[in-house]
UniProtKB/Swiss-Prot annotation:
Gene of this entry: dkgA
Reactions catalysed according to its record: hydroxyacetone + NADP(+) = methylglyoxal + NADPH + H(+)
GO molecular function term, any single one: aldose reductase (NADPH) activity
Gene Ontology BP, a term: L-ascorbic acid biosynthetic process
EC number: 1.1.1.-
Catalytic residue positions: 51 (proton donor)
Protein name: Methylglyoxal reductase DkgA
Binding locations of substrate: 107
Kinase listed as a keyword: no
Residue positions binding NADP(+): 187-241
Length: 277
């Protein structure tokens, strides 16, 4: 199996730097995608309660001949469940057919609802109970993160954010690093590469390294120290996205991709997304 890099989280646990995302995939698509990914060599799978496909992940894991301690499974607490994380986690574990998850993330801060600090305290307790190995967040901006640290004394191990060449969030990435929080990129290919894969620097590097534009962008994430979870349900694409460990981008090449940043957000703004209650 291809040796892949691991990121050491500040709690001491190791997380594969490259994983499979399963957003917008049906249960059946997810089961097939995860099975293929495990066959290819992936060991990290990222799902969420709101994706409504945790059962598909669970079925694939159950059928796979991969030891549990080799896997790294992430799921997420949805906004409506921030008032009852334990029940939400138990439901997720049942669907995943697991005794614990490796990483449990608060999916959005949902600042209007303002339950994320109390939810975080509950995640700390669930971790102590052994139902979660590591705890983290998604889509948290610096004030949200600072408030968690100020009010609970415990920082997330991971902050999963929208991050791709068009939205690099360098200030947030740097702040995370300063506070020993790993940064994980969702939508790492900018939702199928629109506006990215046709950039001259991406096409030039793809030709130079005999790789696809997607592989160049994934390698950019890896060489930037980011955890990356490209989504695919296509077997050939799942394999292609994993075949990125036989080359590295040079410093000046990384810098050239950095210049593509234009602050283009494709997903919701975390400051306003969530409940209106």
């Amino acid at each position: 199996m291809t040796m892949q890099p691991l990121i050491k989280l500040y709690d001491g646990r190791l997380m594969p730097q490259l994983g499979l995302g399963v957003w917008q995939a049906s249960i059946q698509e997810t089961e097939l995608a995860v099975s293929k990914a495990l066959e290819v060599g992936y060991r990290s799978i990222d799902t969420a309660a709101i994706y409504k496909n945790e059962e598909g992940v669970g079925k694939a894991l159950k059928a796979a001949a991969v030891a549990r301690d080799e896997l790294f499974i992430t799921t997420k607490l949805w906004n409506d469940d921030q008032h009852n994380p334990q029940q939400a986690l138990e439901t997720s574990l049942q669907k995943l057919q697991l005794d614990y998850v490796d990483l449990y993330l608060i999916h959005w801060p949902d600042p209007k609802q303002d339950h994320y600090v109390s939810a975080w305290r509950e995640l700390v307790t669930l971790k102590e109970q052994g139902l979660i190995r590591s705890i983290g967040v998604c889509n948290f901006h610096i004030p949200h993160l600072q408030r968690l640290i100020d009010e609970t004394g415990i920082a997330p191990t991971v902050n999963q954010i929208e991050l791709h060449p068009l939205l690099q969030q360098r200030q947030l990435h740097a702040w995370n690093a300063t506070h020993h929080i790993a940064t994980e990129s969702w939508s790492p290919l900018a939702q199928g590469g629109k506006g990215v894969f046709d950039q001259e620097i991406i096409r030039k590097l793809a030709q130079q390294y005999n790789k696809t534009p997607a592989q160049i962008v994934i390698r950019w994430h890896l060489d930037s120290g980011l955890i990356v979870i490209p989504k695919s349900v296509t077997p050939a694409r799942i394999r292609e996205n994993f075949e990125v460990f036989d080359f590295k981008l040079q410093k000046e090449e990384l810098l050239a991709i950095t210049k593509l940043d234009c602050g283009k957000r494709l997903g919701p703004d975390p400051e306003v997304f969530g409940s209106d209650r």
